[in-house]
């Protein structure tokens, strides 16, 4: 086992990273930030998302585990005072894992160039100013012409993030699906959209094709990647063949995560 430590930039997380490195060394576990088999993130969910982006080329070999140093994270299963217990669990690791779908994103520009991204949670496309007008294709078929602030495409694990904030459904990650949620769509007697989030089968794809206009600067996001782009021709979304893998021995069940994150404790009647 080779372990990488990926921490947030705040002083507390940096210190927790140093403490963890010391405990790992004491237990003769190799620290390797270049070619790890386990990546331990220290911080919050944002830190874990950044770590996935850093190790995209190693997703087949790497499993992730999160230590949260602030508020309870959706992806982080351990607290900073449990480092000794975490290392003991690593030493007895049997290779068990739980995997979640990844979003594959292909951006085509007006000059014909392509850029690909992957996301654990979601991707959004919004117009920087004014109403975004875009054709939405499901597969090769035109589904609707959208007018509004933008669109959010999420994975099942990402369904609890921004997707939930814009009224999308929460989806269990064992369902390897895409979800498209509208961001402030325009619906009246002249302009209509479906007005609800759409959940796609694993083999279906979504393409957003903005209608050309004078003001065509778009805000594109993929997890923590946030870009302004003036040359977007279309954005194509699908479920990626790869998955992101997490250590299983302390991995909280999905619906327990949802309850802990959004509801909290419940007094039984």
UniProtKB/Swiss-Prot annotation:
Main location: cytoplasm
Alphabetical keyword list: ATP-binding, Cytoplasm, Kinase, NAD, NADP, Nucleotide-binding, Transferase
Listed Gene3D superfamilies: Probable inorganic polyphosphate/atp-NAD kinase, domain 1, Probable inorganic polyphosphate/atp-NAD kinase, domain 2
Catalytic activity line of the entry: NAD(+) + ATP = ADP + NADP(+) + H(+)
GO molecular function (one): NAD+ kinase activity
Cofactor annotation: a divalent metal cation
GO biological process assignments: NAD metabolic process; NADP biosynthetic process
Purpose: Involved in the regulation of the intracellular balance of NAD and NADP, and is a key enzyme in the biosynthesis of NADP. Catalyzes specifically the phosphorylation on 2'-hydroxyl of the adenosine moiety of NAD to yield NADP.
Designated name of the protein: NAD kinase
The species this protein was found in: Pediococcus pentosaceus (strain ATCC 25745 / CCUG 21536 / LMG 10740 / 183-1w)
């Amino acid at each position: 086992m080779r372990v990488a430590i990926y921490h947030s930039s705040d002083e507390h997380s940096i210190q927790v990273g140093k403490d963890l490195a010391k405990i790992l060394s004491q237990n003769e576990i190799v620290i390797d930030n270049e070619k790890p088999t386990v990546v331990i993130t220290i911080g919050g969910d944002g830190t874990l998302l950044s770590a996935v982006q850093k190790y995209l080329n190693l997703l087949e070999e790497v499993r992730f585990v999160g230590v949260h140093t602030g508020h309870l994270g959706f992806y982080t299963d351990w607290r900073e005072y449990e480092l000794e217990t975490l290392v003991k669990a690593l030493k007895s690791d049997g290779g068990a894992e739980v995997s979640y779908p990844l979003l594959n994103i292909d951006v085509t520009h007006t000059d014909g160039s392509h850029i690909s991204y992957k996301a654990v949670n979601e991707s959004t496309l919004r117009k920087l100013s004014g109403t975004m007008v875009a054709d939405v294709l499901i597969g090769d078929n035109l589904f609707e012409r959208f007018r509004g602030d933008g669109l959010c495409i999420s994975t099942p694990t990402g369904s609890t993030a921004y997707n939930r904030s814009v009224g999308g459904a929460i989806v269990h990650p064992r369902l390897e699906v895409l979800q498209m949620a509208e961001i402030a769509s325009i619906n009246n007697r002249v302009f209509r959209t479906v007005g609800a989030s759409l959940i796609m089968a694993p083999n279906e794809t979504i393409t957003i094709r903005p209608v050309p206009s004078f003001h065509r600067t778009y805000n594109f996001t993929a997890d923590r990647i946030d870009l302004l782009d003036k040359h977007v021709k279309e954005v194509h979304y699908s479920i990626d063949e790869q998955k992101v893998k997490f250590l299983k021995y302390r991995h909280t069940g999905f619906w327990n995560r949802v309850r802990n994150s959004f509801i909290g404790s419940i007094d039984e009647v």
